[in-house]
Amino acid sequence: MKRAHKAPKASHKAHKRQKVEKKPRPEINVPKRKIRLDDLGWNQVSMPDRLEDFEGFYGLEEIEDVHVVKDAVTGNLSFETTKTDEQIEQDIEKAWQREEEEAKFLEKITFGGEPKNGEDVVEEETAPVEDTVEATQDEDAASWGGFSDDDVAQNGDEQSEDVQMVEEDAPPTPNVVLSTTKADGDGEAEPKKMNKRERAAEKKRIAALAKKTKKPDDDEASEGKTFGPGAFDILANRADDEDDEVDVSAWEELELSTKILESLAKLKFSKPTTIQASTIPEIMAGRDVIGKASTGSGKTLAFGIPIIESYLASKSKSKDVKDKTPLALIIAPTRELAHQITAHLTALCAKGAFEAPLIASVTGGLAVQKQRRQLEKADIIVGTPGRLWEVISTGHGLLEKVKQIRFLVVDEADRLLSQGNYKELGEILKILEKDAPAEGEAEAEETTEVERQTLVFSATFQKGLQQKLAGKAKGGSDNLMSKQQSMEYLLKKINFREEKPKFIDANPSSQMASKLKEGLIECAGTEKDLYLYSLLMFYPKKRALIFTNSISAVRRLTPFLQNLALPALPLHSSMAQKARLRSIERFKERPGSILVATDVAARGLDIPKVELVIHYHLPRAADTYVHRSGRTARAEASGSSILICAPEEVGGVRRLIAKVHARADEAPKSKKTAYFIRTLDIDRRIVARLKPRASISKKLADTVIAKEKKHSEDDTLRQAAEDLGVDYDSEEFEKEAKGKKGRGTGRKKKEKEASEMTKGEQQALRAELRGLLSQRINTGVSARYLTSGGIDVDALMAGEGNMEFLGNVDGLGFDEE
């Protein structure tokens, strides 16, 4: 019997078993050593039986007891193991045995039939010839009773010779395996049926045997003889053909050098544009030039070719870097335009058979020290005013070198010279205008005066175009400025060498491209997102550029379009330089991508095959509209520019049309069409069917933005409270702010509601949006009876037309005359 325990007292604590802590066993320090992964014996990964095939993981292997070590300094990866040499050799031997077993198994499934009891399958790759002959003799003796042993012995040598002949001359077929099987009664065994796994193994086996049984005499038999041209001959002939494809005889009238003509031929520029044919001879003659041409007309090469010609004509032979001075200074308003000018000049020089000049790009977002080193050796300097002045003014000796330039180019001059902008440009121009010697210098000292040419280019020179469209219209004439008025406007800003520089206007009658189609869509201010999405549905898989007036609009529209499965990319001035370049590169690479940008992308960007430009907001000035629309219909291509107009923007749109499409005094008064900007009508039924998608996407985008804004505000207030030594409580702060009413309270209430949305609610909205996006937009046809009419079934099956809609969709009216 068990001994009775005493009754526990309330004052005594209950007895508990004391937990014995197990001490960790001391780790045995096993020495590790570096080893190559190829020197280890790998184990095969067994696949589950439920899979019919390996699903792309055929031959998957694994290894154990190997550590991956990354060097903290260099970042290189190395592999270490604790196994000894004996263990590694055992693993390798097991791996070889496994591979031999796999090879035998492949032999069985490849050539049909299974070996009988007591028979071995002899492989050509592993079994030597002598063993093969002996095995064949034994099997013949056991299988055939009609021949004597003497006959078999006499034919042994002949059989070995036959085996050797098979080894040498066997074709790349699976019949090279030497094996014999017994005949059972009726005859030969039927071939075994193979599944997917066995068929894949068979294909690999046949390919390996074909590679190993290739005759070495085939290459020797055709020694000294070629059957057609070689690879290098084909490439050489192809390069010659490409060079001869373009005829550059139209450029010969400009008296360019042979090297430049070769570069133009390789770049496939068959003839000069109007601005190029007009300005290049004047610049090469030494004149100061003011060039006005529509966007996309080739203004970069108009001043780039004469600069390269001057570099080739007066190439400095001095190898001393200190004596080297830059040839040209090109100033652009934005980083993107400066990088694009650099890329165009580099491409022109790279295609030529001459030593290219050193081109330095000086823009913000990059290291100042590196740019300063590049300026010391540069032949051509391209940059923005702010960073140029920062680098030049803080450098040692760079100011004196910049004063020796022979070409000063001001691209997009209307923006650079506008009042109140780019103060650094004024400082640079003042430095270049100081030609007189200092007071302390002796009069006898000779000062070398530099013959500098000043080249000014832009698409707009009208001062009235820079006025705000949202303001009240001022009295007076808003017609295009004449040549005399434009020159007076520029002579006040820039000190030209000549009293009357050459003014060249390539498009006096219009400032827009000839093949540009302009359209206008009227909608409510709160429905701009919906009509933007509807408009993009009519242009599927086409590269589009959307312009806004604010960075916040870019940050809101980009996730809004991304939620709708559209490849949208952002671009604005607050982005890092690398992120801006990344967005532009992705926009160029993807054919149907969409770029949502501010006016930082309105000037100079040359992106090929941009078919659509959408103005989400009315531009602040008319010249901005001209440059925005100039991103499409470039280089004689066609394009569309569509403005989404809210009721409060109607007055600004009227002033925009009056300013942009006004006629100059000397322009011919011919009118081809009865309108300048066509009003486009989108089917309201289609817009109504797209509204649920747009509403959900807008909710999701607003939620993400509201949450980010709340976190940033909390961080700012919390940091301010810590600086003041006060405790910050967000709930108390909101209670005190509840009583305040005024402008913006409704917006703040919506932002608060959006920021409080849970993850579950967001996932539910995303699932609902995915369901809507998986369906086509029905234009009013019967989805159950597709052949009843209204649907082109042949086009639907072939995947032709606009695949976003179910049914026929009319265009927006651009094609109607």
From Swiss-Prot:
Organism: Phaeosphaeria nodorum (strain SN15 / ATCC MYA-4574 / FGSC 10173)
Family designation: Belongs to the DEAD box helicase family. DDX24/MAK5 subfamily.
Top-level taxon of the source organism: Eukaryota
Location relative to the cell: Nucleus, Nucleolus
All residue ranges annotated as the Helicase ATP-binding domain in the record: 280-479
Motif DEAD box: chain residues: 411-414
GO molecular function: ATP binding; ATP hydrolysis activity; RNA binding; RNA helicase activity
UniProt record, GO biological process: rRNA processing
First-tier enzyme category under EC: hydrolase
EC code(s) of this entry: 3.6.4.13
Assigned keywords, A-Z: ATP-binding, Helicase, Hydrolase, Nucleotide-binding, Nucleus, Ribosome biogenesis, RNA-binding, rRNA processing
Cellular compartments per GO CC: nucleolus
Ligand binding (ATP): A293, S294, T295, G296, S297, G298, K299, T300
Record field: compositional bias (Basic and acidic residues): 183-205
Biased composition (Acidic residues): 120-141, 148-170
Pfam families xref list: DEAD, Helicase_C
Task performed by this protein: ATP-binding RNA helicase involved in the biogenesis of 60S ribosomal subunits and is required for the normal formation of 25S and 5.8S rRNAs.
UniProt feature, compositional bias: Basic residues: 1-20, 738-750
Protein name: ATP-dependent RNA helicase MAK5
Position of sequence motif Q motif: 249-277
